[in-house]
Design a protein with these regions (language model features):
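Bacterial N-terminal signal peptides that target proteins for export
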Residues: 1-8
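Bacterial signal peptide processing site
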Residues: 19-25
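Post-signal peptide N-terminal segment of mature Sec-exported envelope proteins
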Residues: 29-54, 68-70, 74-75
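Short, non-transmembrane amphipathic alpha-helical segments
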Residues: 32-34, 74-93, 128, 162-187
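Short secondary-structure junctions
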Residues: 38-46, 91, 130-137
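Short edge beta-strands and adjacent turn/loop segments
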Residues: 42-64, 139-155
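Surface-exposed beta-loop interaction hotspot
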Residues: 97-141, 195
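Extracytoplasmic/periplasmic C-terminal soluble domains
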Residues: 136-195
Length: 195
């Protein structure tokens, strides 16, 4: 008895399944989401890059938002919540990253099959925007993927302080950031600029 026929049937089934998966990209929705984010208060501009799903790889959506210089922490948080809502609904199962540029600071939201509450993402984004406003050049990651402990959101803050900042100044910056986050999960890294 030949094993060729069952092997061909299995390959045909896999090919049909994979072809079906490839048809379920959400590129149109990603572009609509970018337009919606661009219309939110405090937003100067918005762009998106979207990669359709491939065999054994999920789709990838990257949203880029530039905030106006006078944007408030509440406006930044509204962008995070709108993006998170879409990334955990229409784009569930897709790798999602939101990049927000706020003056000389960078804020980022990372998601993939996340189950954090939008209110927890909003709270982390509010603190991130407030910290960015108060500190020197800051990069804040709001991470809502692979976080097992409640609130299923954690933050990572990197601040680049000016060259010549003393050890006491570095520790004060760290303490200020940790105080701003209170009980929210956060890791803080302070780097002194070399130039």
């Amino acid at each position: 008895m030949s094993t060729r026929a069952p092997a061909i049937a299995v390959l045909a089934l896999v090919a049909a399944t994979c072809a079906g998966c490839a048809m379920f990209g959400h590129g149109d929705e990603a572009y609509r989401l970018s337009e919606e984010l661009g219309e939110l208060p405090g937003v100067q501009g918005s762009d998106v890059s979207y990669v359709d799903p491939r065999l054994f790889e999920s789709a990838d959506i990257r949203l880029h938002v530039r905030m106006r210089d006078d944007a408030t922490p509440e406006q930044v948080a509204a962008v995070f919540v709108a993006a998170y809502d879409a990334l955990t609904d229409v784009h569930l199962g897709e790798e999602g990253t939101l990049y927000v540029r706020l003056r000389d600071d960078r804020l980022r939201l990372r998601t993939f099959e996340s189950d954090a509450k939008p209110s927890d993402v909003e709270e982390a984004a509010l603190v991130a925007a407030a910290v960015a406003e108060q500190q020197y050049r800051t990069t804040v990651d709001v991470i809502a993927r692979d976080v097992d402990d409640p609130p299923r959101v954690r933050s990572a803050v990197t601040e680049r302080v000016p060259k010549g900042t003393s050890a006491a100044g570095v520790e004060q910056a760290r303490a200020d950031i940790e105080e701003a986050y209170g009980d929210l999960p956060v890791t803080v890294d302070i780097k002194v600029a070399l130039r």
